[in-house]
């Protein structure tokens, strides 16, 4: 599917371009267009009111390019590239801005399903989410026999869980997220 999917990416004048291009290429996505007007670092963020991937307004130039190239998915990262926003093409030609909870649920389902299909889903699989994030992901995790750990807001608490899993060897970390558009799919 990756070879057929058309993606538009914008770093919103931040540092994410090189990282995002590499990550998308490694994931098998061959058709990635970058919003050139937002590809270089600009401390004034001159083409966007707020460089926040949670905001649909931040996707204006990505949506414009997306319509031009027929993109299926639009991706934006905030200036320091630690939050990722996504919009998906709708049947009517518009783009739907996904919430952090929706992105987290899609990622959890995909990761768990891919591991299940490959026969690599550990019996002690664990996911982490902040306490303010959706419980839908808990239900997704449970449907695969995985355990969900709810932690306080802040990735340092997800990191503490990962460290605990590694020290105790009691769970295998699969992914973690916060509804504020932060995701971590592999231990660091």
Label the predicted regions.
Residues 1-188:
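Phosphate-binding chemistry for phosphorylated carbohydrates and sugar-nucleotides
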């Amino acid at each position: 599917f990756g070879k057929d999917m058309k993606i538009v990416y914008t770093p919103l004048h931040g540092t994410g371009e090189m990282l995002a291009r590499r990550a998308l290429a490694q994931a098998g996505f061959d058709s990635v267009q970058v919003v050139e007007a937002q590809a270089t670092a600009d401390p004034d963020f001159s083409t966007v009111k707020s460089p926040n991937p949670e905001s649909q307004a931040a996707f204006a130039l990505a949506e414009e390019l997306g319509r031009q190239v027929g993109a299926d998915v639009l991706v934006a990262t905030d200036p320091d590239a630690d939050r990722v926003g996504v919009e998906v093409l709708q049947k009517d030609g518009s783009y739907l801005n996904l919430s952090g909870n929706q992105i987290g649920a899609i990622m959890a389902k995909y990761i768990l399903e891919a591991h299940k299909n490959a026969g690599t889903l550990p019996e002690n699989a664990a996911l982490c989410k902040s306490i303010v994030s959706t419980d839908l992901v808990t239900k997704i995790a449970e449907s695969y026999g995985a355990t969900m750990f709810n932690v306080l807001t802040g990735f340092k608490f997800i990191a503490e869980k990962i460290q605990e899993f590694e020290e105790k060897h009691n769970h295998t970390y699969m992914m973690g997220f916060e509804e504020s558009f932060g995701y971590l799919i592999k231990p660091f």
